[in-house]
A protein has these predicted regions:
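Hydrophobic beta-strand positions that form the internal "hydrophobic ladder"
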Residues: 112, 188-192, 236-237, 286, ...
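Asp-box/WD-like beta-propeller blade repeats and closely related beta-sheet repeat scaffolds
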Residues: 158-181, 192-240, 244-251, 261-267
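Non-catalytic accessory segments flanking enzyme active sites
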Residues: 62-183, 194, 273-302, 307-327, ...
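Active-site-proximal cap/loop segments of hydrolase catalytic domains
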Residues: 572-801
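Short loop/turn segments that connect beta-strands within beta-propeller blades
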Residues: 132, 209-213, 254-258, 302-306, ...
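Long hydrophobic segments that form regular secondary structure
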Residues: 268-356, 360-368, 373-375, 383, ...
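Cap/lid segment of the alpha/beta-hydrolase catalytic domain
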Residues: 164-185, 194-200, 211-216, 481-485, ...
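Structural motif
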Residues: 120-130, 200-206, 244-252, 294-300, ...
Length: 801
């Protein structure tokens, strides 16, 4: 703790130029929390644990907040020598960014919508221009789409341009600001959007008049994700969350009326399930889904008949995941009933009934399979339906793929009505055979992430695809499904990273054999073209590995400074993620969750053993569930990593999953298992939960944990407990000063108060006091936060400028 000298009231001393005596300044020390063993101990399956730091989970305890503030002060002290490097990194982020920019417009109804950013502004402004009918092939009415989006210039407004939501104006006076989702009304006069000013992701529903910018409704609070309109532009659909932050209900709010009169459309009582919805591209429907990790059910709600209840179109079958997309006169479904990697099926539309809601008896014999994946892939993920085509998202060989099919029979209202009446509509000749959207995208081992850009208009005729990688800035490509031709609409400009400069780097896919001798782990590796595998370079290994989320290679200007300094960057596509398909995910969760951690360690050892990275110069990073990964590998292989960046880390996993009252816990039991009822799951989680496996007397890597006080997903008490346990375990250790010679000025072995928490391998925690799971809002706040983390990591591997 710093002790500053007290100001003097003695004027005579000042007049005489004599300074009052100063108290001896004491060097700051790492904060240490009092150990308060839990009484009675936590006891399950014959195992007891008197947790000494469980009290740190109490966010209402002033002593806990005081400790958080002291942790921030200690982080300030440790990172103070790194300010110059942090400032340099921010300058480089800025230099690589075109700050005044626009996005490719997306059509919704009668307008093209796009975002603007401006130099000096923290947030985006959502804009629009009216649709201009310039395509001679289109009939002269508003539903006819031009062949391609218009060109919008960053330096001047477009004719007829107007502001939909200016986030900078809305954020004025707020320490934190985030727009969760937004949707314009069908008549184009209003926009409904979700506002968060604390970071806890409990939103307020706002409705704004676009022409005047006036807020016309801001009465509905405690809202979850999702916003959609009725066809008459009078009512808005939203979700409500319960005390455990589970979106469990869908409600309909009439704009301008008292929320007490809102109508509940759907209630999900099963705590394992969470509801969400989206406006279908077919404007007649909103698609509502209730899903757990392994099971889901889909309803359709008719926007033209807002007084009707949603109707179930899939039923609920345990272990079967399903998604549904209205395709005009029928449904397209992705489901796992026949293959865990998914099947694409076609089915009749439902008949809308006033009572709706209840899970009807679905006749699965009317589902006709169009595409079925085998047990090892490809993994079918999603289908997007339009008036004349559909696009299928999938994974194959560890990478993203897109296929499309075109309609061979037109969509008509008569056909839609017939589909709803028939049990077995004639599915023959409705769709063409699937074709690749960009057939050569992955030729010669190219690493590329392809995704559709979120087109929302039923009448769109082009497929817009965004292609990117770690070294390739996002490129938006328009594909004409009539002949498969493609042309580039826009490539994101990145100053200081043009094609010639990118040519100096290699981005490749390598395969690492796991310790079991047969599992092949895909890794995306980026390095200088002239890099030598001589065991001297610094390395940066990033991982996630949970929830079947794929950690795909995507571009970020924030990575460029490290790569340009010669750091070898690697993405480990480990089990528990979805990179290789559903089976890859299943082989890294519940009873076999440790595969996630051993895969990451095996990739790290490959980087060192192959000479890509020097021993003691490997950075590891992960966030959220990837933070659990960081905590686990820190315990399992502390000698492998020089420094750990753990963002909002889920490091007290067993404690959280044992408490059903906490946000998300019950729904997480399908992901991790239920340790309350299952002894084996308890034992497995006990074996890897990071906080409970910190060992005394171990030389751990330098660690920076980052969190936010209002994070709902991973409570800040988790990293707080973890950091305190690490300090407790390492107190009194001695660290070899000789390591300083390996890293030059990066290592300083000064110790404070007799502890081994030296600047050489500090353990620090940075807490954002007004933010949520994603950290500070606004791009400059985000840059500053990440620059501090990156400077901490780079300095630990000998990169100080």
């Amino acid at each position: 703790m710093h002790h500053s000298s007290a100001p003097s009231d003695n004027k005579q001393h000042h007049d005489a130029g004599i300074q009052p005596p100063r108290a001896q300044a004491q060097p700051p020390v790492p904060p240490r929390a009092q150990s308060r063993p839990l009484d009675p101990p936590r006891s399950f399956h014959g195992d007891s644990f008197a947790d000494p730091f469980q009290w740190l989970r109490c966010a209402d305890d002033p002593a806990v907040i005081d400790l958080v503030e002291k942790e921030n002060a200690w982080a300030d002290h440790v990172t103070a020598p790194l300010h110059a490097l942090s400032d340099t990194l921010v300058s480089e982020f800025k230099a690589h960014t075109v700050e005044t920019d626009v996005t490719v417009p997306i059509r919704i109804g009668q307008y093209w919508y796009f975002d603007r950013t401006a130099e000096g502004s923290q947030y985006v402004s959502h804009q629009r221009v009216p649709v201009t009918l310039v395509n001679d092939e289109s009939p002269a009415h508003v539903d006819a789409a031009p062949l391609a989006p218009p060109t919008i210039h960053a330096d001047r407004p477009a004719p007829g341009e107007e502001t939909v939501i200016d986030e900078n104006a809305q954020a004025a006076g707020e320490e934190f600001f985030s727009v969760g989702e937004w949707a314009p009304s069908p008549d184009g006069t209003r926009v409904a959007w979700l506002k968060d000013t604390s970071g806890d992701e409990r939103y307020t529903l706002v409705v704004t008049d676009i022409a005047s910018g006036r807020t016309v409704d801001e009465k509905v609070t405690n809202v979850g994700y999702g916003v959609a309109w009725s066809a008459d532009s009078a009512s808005v659909l939203y979700t409500r969350v319960d005390d455990a932050w589970r979106a469990c209900q869908v409600w309909l709010h009439v704009v301008g009326e008292d929320p007490a009169h809102d109508r509940r459309l759907l209630d999900e009582p099963d705590e394992r399930f969470e509801v969400y919805f989206e406006q279908a591209r077919d404007p007649n429907w909103v698609v509502i889904t209730s899903a757990s990790t392994s099971t889901s059910e889909v309803w359709l709600w008719p926007t033209l008949q807002p007084h009707h209840m949603p109707v179930s179109v899939t039923g609920r079958r345990p272990g079967v995941l399903v998604s549904a997309e209205p395709a005009g006169d029928h449904l397209l479904l992705i489901h796992t009933a026949d293959s865990r990697e998914g099947s694409l099926a076609i089915a009749p539309l439902p008949q809308v009934r006033d009572e709706g809601g209840a899970a009807e008896s679905v006749d699965y014999s009317t589902w006709h399979t169009l595409i079925e994946a085998d047990s090892q892939g490809p993994r079918l993920l999603d289908v997007e339906a339009y008036e004349s085509m559909c696009v299928i998202s999938m994974r194959r060989d560890g990478q993203t793929w897109l296929d499309y099919m075109t309609r061979t029979a037109p969509t008509t209202p008569e056909a839609a009505a017939a589909s709803a009446r028939q049990h077995r509509p004639d599915y023959a000749q409705i769709w063409s055979e699937p074709r690749a959207v960009l057939p050569g995208a992955h030729d010669n081992g190219a690493v590329l992430t392809m995704n559709t850009v979120g087109q929302l208009d039923w009448h769109d005729r082009l497929i817009l695809v965004e292609c990117q990688s770690i070294t390739q800035p996002p490129r938006t490509v328009a594909v004409d499904p009539r002949d498969g031709s493609a042309h580039v609409l826009r490539e994101k400009a990145v100053p200081g990273w043009d094609a010639e400069q990118r040519a100096g780097y290699v981005e490749e896919r390598v395969w690492v054999t796991a310790r079991d001798g047969h599992t092949r782990i895909p890794v995306t590796l980026v390095h200088r073209r002239d890099a030598a595998c001589d065991g001297r370079a610094a390395g940066w290994l990033y991982g996630y590995g949970s929830y079947e989320i794929s950690n795909d290679p995507e571009f970020s200007v924030l990575r460029l400074p490290a790569i340009q300094r010669g750091v070898v960057f690697a993405l480990a596509h480990i089990r528990g993620g979805g990179e290789m398909g559903r089976w890859w995910y299943e082989d890294g969760r519940r009873e076999v969750k440790t595969h996630t951690f051993t895969d990451f360690i095996d990739v790290g050892r490959f980087l060192v053993d192959a000479g890509w990275v020097a021993p003691h110069r490997l950075i590891a990073e992960g966030r959220s569930a990837g933070g659990l990964l960081m905590g686990a590998v820190t315990n399992m292989a502390p000698d492998l990593f020089r420094v750990i960046l753990a963002g909002v880390p889920f490091v007290d996993a067993l404690t959280s999953i044992l408490d059903p009252s906490l946000p998300l816990t019950v729904g997480e039991w399908e992901e991790w298992g239920n340790p309350i009822e299952d002894r084996e799951i308890y034992t497995v989680m006990k074996s890897y939960s990071p906080y409970e496996n910190v060992a005394d007397g171990v030389e751990y890597p330098a660690i920076m944990a980052s969190t936010s006080i209002n994070d709902t997903r991973v409570l800040f008490g988790e990293p707080l407990k973890w950091v305190q346990r690490l300090r407790q375990a390492t107190a009194g250790n001695t660290t070899a000063a000789g390591r300083a010679s390996e890293l030059g000025s990066a290592a300083v072995t000064t110790t404070f108060a007799g502890q081994s928490d030296p600047t050489e391998r500090p353990i620090i925690m940075r807490t954002q006091m007004v933010a949520g799971h994603r950290g500070p809002s606004g791009r400059y706040g985000h840059w500053a936060s990440r620059a501090e983390e990156f400077a901490f990591a780079l300095s630990q591997v000998g990169i100080n400028e």
